[in-house]
Amino acid sequence: MLHPRARTMLLLSLPAVAIGIASSLILIVVMKIASVLQTLLWQRLPGTLGIAQDSPFWIIAILTLTGIAVGLVIRFSQGHAGPDPACEPLIGAPVPPSALPGLIVALILGLAGGVSLGPEHPIMTVNIALAVAIGARLLPRVNRMEWTILASAGTIGALFGTPVAAALIFSQTLNGSSEVPLWDRLFAPLMAAAAGALTTGLFFHPHFSLPIAHYGQMEMTDILSGAIVAAIAIAAGMVAVWCLPRLHAMMHQIKNPVLMLGVGGFILGILGVIAGPVSLFKGLDEMQQMVANQAFSTSDYFLLAVIKLAALVVAAASGFRGGRIFPAVFVGVALGLMLHEHVPAVPAAITVSCAILGIVLVVTRDGWLSLFMAAAVVPNTTLLPLLCIVMLPAWLLLAGKPIMMVNRPKQQPPHDNV
């Protein structure tokens, strides 16, 4: 016979597995549709028209039209494509299900059109809303927070292809009760995360790891080098943190979302022309291209880091529906490669991983997620002790500093009140 604690944990096991699978399938379908549309917009259509896909005209035109299209969705769809991600944390309160179709369409358009945001925030919003709405009907005795946690865990597992990230994140958020052991509280979320990760793995494997030279033995000087790299990344990230609310307020002086996002898309197009196509889109595939291209110099990496960070701020400030983690990882990789090119004595594994740790820490203010992303992109067990040590001064630097999020306006724009 099972102990009552075990029976309690098993109660949510089946819903947890179902939510994890559903979270992954939603992500897979959205990404597949976005990929097909991206191929149409950036390969087939310019080829048919006899235009180079990397021509300045095409980049500016597609991103401007993407902004206008997303603006139309936000203006006229029911629920206005959900809340503004710039004003929301990664895991937020459930939104009305009526807002989800518009949010999904806005996300697909942004991903396919080359906007420098990832899918994580909208997908999280969709999965939480569906889990809460359906779960409340099927099992009304389970509170909304439980459904939110399961959907969040399933989505994190699906996004990163492993339940490890969910375990790290929820180990700090669920450890609030001394009466219930932590692993009792983690059981159902980890079931959801594992189901999400395994389902994603059946269709595709997220490629986070980069072909960077293996790091051998840790030296004391490497700790100092890593701390300096993380501090540089944090400084760059804090510039973006300072710019985001100010640019957000400036862009939202334009009350019409179609015009506002059209202007935002035009600016993104100009930034894309400056840095080239590798600076577009969410950044995961593009950082693989960046590492594979041996022709990039220190100045090229610097330009890519600055432009991608600027594009991230512009996209978020303009109201595009997307997340900030994936493009931030791209910025970290570009910064790390730049610093390695500038000081070759410092291994690329250190510069890249510590730059990712610093910039993701600025964006998420989550130490576990920052460590996970750094270790996922540069998978080397020798680096783990170094990253844990470097995290300490990085966390001190950010203590009490503002986060990369805009305070919600006291009065929403007219198109958000409809």
Swiss-Prot record:
GO terms for cellular component: plasma membrane. The chain crosses the membrane at residues 10-30, 54-74, 99-119, 120-140, 149-169, 186-206, 223-243, 258-278, 300-320, 322-342, 343-363, 386-406. Keywords: Cell membrane, Ion channel, Ion transport, Membrane, Transmembrane, Transmembrane helix, Transport. GO terms for molecular function: chloride transmembrane transporter activity; monoatomic ion channel activity. It is a multi-pass membrane protein. It is found in: Cell membrane. Pfam families: Voltage_CLC. Belongs to the chloride channel (TC 2.A.49) family. NCBIfam families: PRK03655.1. This is Putative ion-transport protein YfeO.
